[in-house]
């Protein structure tokens, strides 16, 4: 590399070791950590290793893919974690009251960080700079770029393995105060196991997808199962908060072309990525993939500019009126809203759009119905009954849009697990004793 020029001088003068970089963080400060697979693990490890020098550092994060060691009890006086989403490494600490949870739509996190929770420091991971001094945020643009732009200090792990994604995904090195070179593997998310139930759900969902539709897919076995049954479709598009390896397969098969899109034609649009090296190799320097901050990608009014936008999400529980719970089990917080509501609303604004909730009919090894007469006490409604168009299980499709409460209940009971239909029907008869 030619190290001549102003930005190159900046780069050399702002190179730090991980230990040196975290020395710039002070007690009482607010630190935002890049999202999901963009998490700079080497910097977080250094932060925790130097925990003794900190007191009450607030750490804001969404999906934590690493160990989230800062949540461990021995660091309660050093770090305070404020989560926008709970996962496997943070859920138990939240249940014990050692982690705070802040409910917020994914699309609104950037404005929250600019106005209400302005960070002192942002920790992120990026690609090496190009000839002009720009680094790409790679797999995590979402709230990471807005946080960096709002922060007093940015500490970045510069990683040769981070794919250089295109779009509005760049920072200039002169926006970064501490640069830490470390070529660690980018965090990967292995493809989920898809069982018979997920396959049946995927086939039912795919039956509602038409040639030329634009898709939003969530994370997990059900979205991946849907992709298995789209191989006979044509000219599908992608406008989604995230995608994984399954999308790459459909691109290579010629199913996803983005040719019919009415916004960003020819490009798959996302705000973060979770997958394996196959995905990361595909998106690297690929102009067919455009990454933008989440306040753009997940803006319902932007989403709605895509005709025939099909949002496909999953949930924890649905009552027989069509109210959806996706983030809690009673009073126990288990995840976060993410982009579900953003895309449900966007699908409803889209010409020809469809908002789909897809889930197994039961949980707890088949002992608990996910379609219920009443939501569990304390559960927070994620998506209202006014916004869901379809609910899908392995037993079929319930169309709710335009249906009365009576008709919704009848449709949802039909797709419930057979073991629970009598119980649901009894409640239905109590509410609606008169036949029409």
Description of each model-found segment:
Residues 1-436:
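Conserved alpha/beta enzyme-core scaffold
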């Amino acid at each position: 590399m030619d190290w001549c020029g102003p930005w190159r001088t900046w780069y050399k003068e702002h190179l730090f070791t991980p230990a040196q970089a975290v020395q710039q963080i002070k007690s009482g400060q607010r630190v935002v950590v890049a999202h999901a697979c963009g998490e700079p693990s080497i910097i977080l490890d250094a932060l925790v290793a130097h925990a003794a020098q900190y007191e009450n550092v607030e750490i804001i994060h969404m999906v934590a893919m690493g160990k989230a060691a800062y949540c461990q009890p021995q660091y309660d006086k050093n770090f305070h974690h404020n989560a926008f989403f709970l996962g496997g490494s943070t859920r138990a600490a939240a249940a014990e009251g050692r982690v705070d949870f802040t409910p917020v739509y994914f699309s609104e996190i950037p404005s929250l960080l600019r106005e209400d929770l302005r960070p002192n420091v942002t920790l992120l991971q990026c690609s090496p700079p190009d000839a002009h001094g720009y680094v790409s945020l790679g797999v995590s643009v979402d709230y990471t770029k807005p946080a960096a732009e709002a922060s007093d200090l940015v500490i970045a792990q510069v990683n040769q393995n981070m794919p250089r994604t295109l779009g509005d995904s760049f920072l200039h090195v002169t926006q970064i105060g501490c640069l830490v070179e470390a070529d660690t593997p980018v965090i990967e998310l292995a493809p989920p196991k898809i069982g018979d139930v997920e396959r049946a759900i995927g086939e039912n969902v795919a039956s509602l997808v038409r040639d030329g539709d634009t898709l939003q897919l969530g994370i997990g076995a059900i979205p991946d199962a849907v992709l298995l049954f789209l191989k006979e479709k044509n000219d599908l598009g992608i406008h989604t908060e995230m995608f994984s390896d399954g999308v790459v397969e459909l691109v290579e098969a010629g199913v996803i072309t983005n040719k019919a899109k009415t916004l960003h034609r020819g490009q798959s649009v996302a705000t973060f990525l979770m997958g394996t090296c196959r995905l990361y190799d595909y998106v690297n320097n690929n102009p067919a993939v455009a990454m933008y901050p989440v306040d753009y990608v997940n803006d319902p009014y932007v989403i709605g500019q895509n005709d025939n936008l099909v949002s496909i999400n999953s949930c924890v529980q649905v009552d027989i009126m069509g109210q959806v719970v996706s983030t809690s089990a009673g009073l126990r917080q288990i995840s976060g809203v993410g982009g579900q509501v953003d895309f449900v609303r966007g699908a409803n604004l889209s010409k020809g759009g469809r908002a789909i909730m897809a889930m197994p009919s039961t949980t707890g090894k088949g002992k608990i119905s996910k379609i219920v007469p009443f939501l569990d006490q304390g559960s927070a409604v994620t998506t209202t009954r006014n916004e869901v168009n379809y609910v899908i299980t392995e037993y079929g499709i319930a169309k709710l849009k335009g249906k009365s409460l009576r008709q919704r209940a009848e449709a949802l009971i039909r797709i419930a697990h057979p073991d629970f239909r009598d119980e649901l029907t009894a409640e239905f008869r109590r509410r609606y004793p008169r036949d029409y």
